Amino acid sequence: MSGYQRPFIRNYASDVEDLKKEADRLETDKSASTTGVLDYEKQSEVVLYFDHIYPMPISGLSLKRKFLSPIQNRVTTDDLKQKVLDLSSTDSNPLPENTKISEFVPLKRDAGAFVKFEVPPETTCKELINQIVSNLEENEVQHNKNIFNYVKNLFWNKFPKCYQVKGTPWIEDLRRYPSPKLKVIFEGDPLTEEELYLLFRRYGLIVDIIPVSSSNPTATIIFKYLRSAVCAKNCITGISLNSSMTTLHLQYIPIERVNYLMDFIVNHQKITIPAIVALLATLAVLIFDPIRQLFIEQHITHKYSLETYKDNRYVKVVYYPYRSLVQWLNNSYDYIDEKLNQVYEGKGDLEVTSEDSENINILWNERFEKIKQLKLWIYENINTFIVVKGPKGSGKEEFVLDHTLNNDEKLKRKVLYIDCDALVKARSDNGLIKTTARQLGYFPVFTWTNSISQFVDLGVQGLTGQKSGLSESKETQLKNMFSLTTQALRNIALSDYEDYRNDTIKQQKRRTRKTENNTDEKPSISVEEEIIKEEDYLQQHPEAKPIIVVNNFQRKSDGNNDMIYKLIAEWTSSLVQSNMSHVIFITHDVGSVQHLTDSLPNQVFKTISLSDASQRSAKQYVWNQLNDPSLMNPDSLDKYIEPLGGRMLDLQAFIRRIKSGESANDALSEMVNQASEQITTFFLNNTVANESDSNWNTAQVWAIMKFLSENDSFEYNELSKISLFKSSNETLATLAALEKHDLISFTREKGVLSRISTGRPLYKAAFKELINDRKVYKLYETDYYNNLITIESTKIFKLEDEINKISRLSDIKYLKNRLEYVSSKINTATETIMKYEEKIKEIGKLNEKSSSSFLGIKFN
């Protein structure tokens, strides 16, 4: 049979009901929430949909629904049933007596509920529906008579509405969240726009209807309001029309949200990436900088440390048991270490401890006046830029920290200690940042961001050929850290300024009251005139300013981080210029003052020079540490102390050697040999001396060693008498190198170099040891005279060249005197060379057997 044949149309409602009956034969739970189908008798029951029974916001996001549902939905189902009955009835038009809710099916995602009413026998379904709808509208009118409810409903109408369920409700809890757009799927013949409008308009304003087309078998209904689409979907879905030839299935069309911000970021990266980086940097500054500043202030003042409040009676309850426990553990560890050392080595403690504080004070009594001078300079508060100089091992750090600052209750409260040596020895940029942050108290610090920014910068440079500017150099990061530390120092310095201001105002008010009572007195000055400025306050209260102690400050170092010296010099100079803190530099490198001079060119630095301990103090210190005639004869102590001088490091090394079982002769001899080996390996080695980093002359070093082996010091002018030191640049370079490595030290008068002495007393004995060694003496003394011969030969060559030039002239009678002068110079230089050669021959005849004494030059 040919011709058009209508497709088979199944009845949606009957099919679903049959499927449910077939599937639920053995099930006990046949509720609508489980099966998704709401059964009802159309003759005796009606199903209505009430919207806004639940708050609508819970259906927006799953997280919001999960966390807010327990708070917003604390009402029970019985409460909601009663609420629906109250909304469906009025005093003027109550519901029939036998009307009751037989089933209440919540639909929380859509903020509504399906309510099944049993229709009383004396009432029809239509009458009951009309009565409920009219009562609901009347209740809404009464609700809006309240001005607040009326204004609220203008912006967001949350009063429930009621609609009859025309189709077969599908109660599902899928993640299909409500939207104003509905997709209409037709099972059978589709409906026209007019038919769709007629069917859906009752639920709210419709923005547009997109009917079925050849390319799209579904229709789209776009409502103006979300609640209209929700009501239409729950009431119309499953409806059968045209004599069950057409069935409608409705679904929400997800809202396609356009993120304009993300689109702008993706499409305009050249603008957005720098803007995002700037925003993140700003947020980081606003969030982390106050935290870092607080940690810096805590690091300097120890405001929140138990040690600060140890005298408080409440803190004592916790502090003293804690300190006792820590001391007990430390003493236990020391006891175990000492016993293990005695068992394995058979000897006692080899380390010099501080058990006898009087032994240490012997050395510091000589520096008492300098300690007083340092404190006086701090309290004078006049450009407090102090430099404490001294050789290594002279106790500069203890002098400043332990004996000057920590002995003063006011000064020790605000001390920031910076060790340049730890900063310079950092192996990487991140290590330098971490070490600096640790010493400043700068926390938190994120060094991993440097690696990420450098990686991104490298990638951008590879793609575009230009750097992105995201990464910062270590100098910039250090400057930022010092800048934040400056703010913290200012807050610390002015921490008591507000109290001073309030006290001044109170005193002024008291005087004002007295003046008002006594009319004869003249009015005093105003409060604002009496309160001094912050700068003047800091000038009058030097104890309020924090103290910056910079240790191991040098001119340069061998590492890649020597720029830290210049940065610290510039930073501390700005602190002194702004009168914000006292600055104390501790250095053994005289050349380091150049950085300070560059930072403060017009500033005269206050300098304290620390020398070694006196012979008497050194002798008493060593004997008090040994205090055992079996280890050393006290009568021969002077013999061994004299080569060591008063250098604390050498004295302690000598004591350790004796306590370890060496004799005094062996201990001193070994120390001198080590110093001699250090000198020959580093300074008298021609290979090392010719390197680019070594700017000294070996022959000059040998000549200076000979001077100092015979004398404690000598005049600087003595060097100018030797032709080897005629070149001032080379001479100054050699002297600077020797001073840096502590072989020599300078004495200046009015800033002018006057005398040269041995830097480390042990080196004087080493000089004598080397010169007393015939083999070493022959080697370097020969080299010394060869250098002198080279200088004289160069001089002769220049003079001969001058004679050759004069001889080429046509008339030389006017230059006769000049020729005679040059000739005499050549003869003198030649005679000098002959003398030097004779010296070399005499040196070559010396026996290479060494003398037994290093305390003098004795050749047999």
Swiss-Prot record:
<keyword id="KW-0496">Mitochondrion</keyword>
<feature type="transmembrane region" description="Helical">
    <location>
        <begin position="271"/>
        <end position="291"/>
    </location>
</feature>
<feature type="topological domain" description="Mitochondrial matrix">
    <location>
        <begin position="13"/>
        <end position="270"/>
    </location>
</feature>
<keyword id="KW-0812">Transmembrane</keyword>
<feature type="domain" description="RRM">
    <location>
        <begin position="180"/>
        <end position="255"/>
    </location>
</feature>
<dbReference type="InterPro" id="IPR035979">
    <property type="entry name" value="RBD_domain_sf"/>
</dbReference>
<keyword id="KW-0999">Mitochondrion inner membrane</keyword>
<feature type="transit peptide" description="Mitochondrion">
    <location>
        <begin position="1"/>
        <end position="12"/>
    </location>
</feature>
<keyword id="KW-0472">Membrane</keyword>
<keyword id="KW-0694">RNA-binding</keyword>
<feature type="topological domain" description="Mitochondrial intermembrane">
    <location>
        <begin position="292"/>
        <end position="860"/>
    </location>
</feature>
<protein>
    <recommendedName>
        <fullName>Mitochondrial escape protein 2</fullName>
    </recommendedName>
</protein>
<dbReference type="InterPro" id="IPR018850">
    <property type="entry name" value="Mt_escape_2_C"/>
</dbReference>
<comment type="function">
    <text>Plays a role in maintaining the mitochondrial genome and in controlling the mtDNA escape. Involved in the regulation of mtDNA nucleotide structure and number. May have a dispensable role in early maturation of pre-rRNA.</text>
</comment>
<dbReference type="GO" id="GO:0003723">
    <property type="term" value="F:RNA binding"/>
</dbReference>
<keyword id="KW-0507">mRNA processing</keyword>
<dbReference type="InterPro" id="IPR034260">
    <property type="entry name" value="Yme2_RRM"/>
</dbReference>
<dbReference type="GO" id="GO:0006397">
    <property type="term" value="P:mRNA processing"/>
</dbReference>
<keyword id="KW-0809">Transit peptide</keyword>
<dbReference type="InterPro" id="IPR027417">
    <property type="entry name" value="P-loop_NTPase"/>
</dbReference>
<dbReference type="GO" id="GO:0000002">
    <property type="term" value="P:mitochondrial genome maintenance"/>
</dbReference>
<keyword id="KW-1133">Transmembrane helix</keyword>
<dbReference type="GO" id="GO:0005743">
    <property type="term" value="C:mitochondrial inner membrane"/>
</dbReference>
<dbReference type="Pfam" id="PF10443">
    <property type="entry name" value="RNA12"/>
</dbReference>
<dbReference type="InterPro" id="IPR039627">
    <property type="entry name" value="Yme2_C"/>
</dbReference>
<comment type="similarity">
    <text>Belongs to the YME2 family.</text>
</comment>
